């Protein structure tokens, strides 16, 4: 986590060029709906949106996904939704579910875990996040439905139900 980006965001300054993002950030900051932090805070929904670069052997590096999962694990509670949006190889959502259950065995079967790939083009991110169809797959049908309910609040495109492994393809 870059502390300078956190500080700038909390002042309402966006560090990247993305049409409409500065205005949106200013608006949500004005209403107290956005707070950047370098550590997770308690929530009902946790979105994992981190880079997944390739290693030297052309294999995806999911270490950022794992690190983010480990960061939020202490904050998860019964009924929470955990969604990975980072581009990830098939099986990543299940691996992170197993990691969460290893770290927090009391939450097995009590939290919702899903995958919803972020597929947007730079320069059109805000529009595409809201307008594009989304594929949403949970580790079970209850997780899929919980994620669908969440995305329905802001996605105008069609929400396609599936399982996590299919969504990761």
Residue ranges of predicted features:
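Redox-cofactor binding/interface segments in oxidoreductases and associated redox assembly factors
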Residues: 46-48, 84, 137
């Amino acid at each position: 986590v870059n502390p300078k980006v956190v500080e700038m965001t909390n002042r309402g300054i966006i560090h990247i060029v993305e049409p409409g993002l500065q205005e949106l950030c200013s608006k949500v900051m004005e209403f107290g709906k956005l707070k950047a932090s370098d550590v997770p805070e308690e929530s009902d929904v946790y979105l994992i949106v981190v880079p997944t670069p390739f290693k030297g052997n052309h294999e995806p590096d999911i270490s950022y996904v794992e690190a983010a999962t480990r960061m939020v694990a202490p904050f998860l509670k019964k009924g929470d939704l955990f969604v990975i949006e980072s581009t990830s190889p098939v099986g990543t959502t299940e691996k992170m579910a197993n990691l969460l259950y290893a770290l927090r065995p009391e939450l097995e079967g009590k939290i919702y875990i899903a995958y919803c790939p972020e597929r947007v083009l730079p320069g059109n991110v805000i529009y595409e996040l809201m307008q594009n169809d989304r594929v949403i797959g949970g580790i079970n049908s209850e997780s899929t439905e919980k994620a669908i309910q969440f995305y329905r609040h802001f996605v105008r495109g069609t929400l396609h139900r599936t399982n996590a492994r299919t969504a990761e393809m």
